[in-house]
Amino acid sequence: YNLSLKAKKMIEKYTKNLALELNTIGLINIQFAMKNNKIYVIEVNPRASRTIPFISKIKDIPFAKYAAQVSVGKKLMELNLKEKNIGFIAVKKPVFPFNKFPEQKVFLSPEMKSTGEVIGFDKHLGSAYAKAELGAGAELPQKGNVFISVNDSDKNEIIHIARDFNEIGFDIIATSGTSEILNNNGIKCNNIFKVGEGRPNIVDSIKNNEISIIINTPLGEQSRYDEYKIGKAAIQFKIPVITTISGATAVIRAIRIGNKKLTYSSLQEIFK
């Protein structure tokens, strides 16, 4: 939801150019990355991916069926494909096996760790995100303590996020560096020790059921050690862990709406 219209148009252009230049017949999977408003191609694969079921549902187009027909000689023009804009936001939420494999680190890397996906579908981002969380077996809390620890590059952006959590009734607990910048910007928060700094530390608070949500964007070797300890405790006590600023923003929107205000429709009702 944070891509500009210009960026989306450029991605569409690059996709079309790559598909034509590579003489693609059937499906093609392209992974893009964006940094400092520049778009990069990570890899291109002449195959389907797990994204196909997702986009087939949100567009109401059986892409796998059409790809098979193209592969055996049909032309795209013969299939009469039409773009559908239904005015909904779709959130794809990965499902991780962390509760089954507690030794796995909850913080992500290029390595594939998810074992499935669910979709949250709504006209508003907050509602779509909340539905995706529920579908993945997680219910976002409506009150309690939010633990925040972010790296230096995220500290300016975390200010408005912490302020929003205060506004919707959460108390803030933060590590020393994050706590300092929040207090300096008029956001009341309590300081807590990192792992290895003293006791009680953040892991102790998690085990004492004193934490409702964790926002942690680690960077560096010591932070990675902390993340492992925090993540392991969070899995054990079923506490949501948010590892990006954009994820924290979406969580706030979802909590503002609340699970009781969600409405549900089948895909058949949406696309009729």
What are these regions (language model features)?
Residues G169-I181:
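Short internal beta-strands
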Residues F193-K194, I202-K272:
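Peripheral docking tails and interdomain loops at the edges
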Residues Y1-Q142:
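ATP-dependent carboxylate activation and anion-phosphoryl transfer catalytic cores
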Residues L134-V146, F165, S205-I211:
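Glycine-rich phosphate/diphosphate-binding loops that line cofactor/substrate pockets in enzymes
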